[in-house]
Amino acid sequence: IMPDIIAPVIPETITVHLGAPDSAAQNVVVPFVDYIKNVASSEIYPTWPENALRANIYAIISYALNRIYTEWYRSRGYDFDITNTTRYDQAFVPDRDIFENINDIVDEIFDEYVVREGSIQPLFTQFCNGTTSTCAGLSQWGTVSLAEQGLSPLEILKSFYGDDILILTDTPVPSVGESYPGEPLRPGDDSNSVKVIQTELNRI
């Protein structure tokens, strides 16, 4: 029997390890939206064209959600979702200033992420700066020239990750209060509420 596919949700928080995976570094629990704002402010420049910023922020969101959804670190026995070192993940700098335009874009699109067509799993949107380092994924500086050519955020992303990608929007953002379905769960229930709670229990 195939297990039920649990659709991703936007988590309230993300646990960030402030160092390499095996280092004795501190873990910090950060609201997911604030984490995305911090990473975007640490990884890209606020003066870039807006569509370049949006493409990069989509990649940052999708990368973080992929780490959470696949339980990349937790399935390996770690007690965190992601690290803050760019050797392994994406930059997160505690207590840094957030750029106003990045703040506003993240508030608008934090519940949107990249997938392959036919999939609901957040895409592993690897990226690098495209100057001092290159990789198979997105080139951060490369997004600038593409945005200047008039490409949309999705067109920019397709140029790096392939034409078979989509941006899923309006991803659910359940809070602890919202995960109660409004009526008691009973034996034999097979609703999405059961699946949400099963997923939460599996993560404990």
Can you describe what each PLM-predicted range is?
Residues 1-204:
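Conserved, single-site charged/polar hotspot
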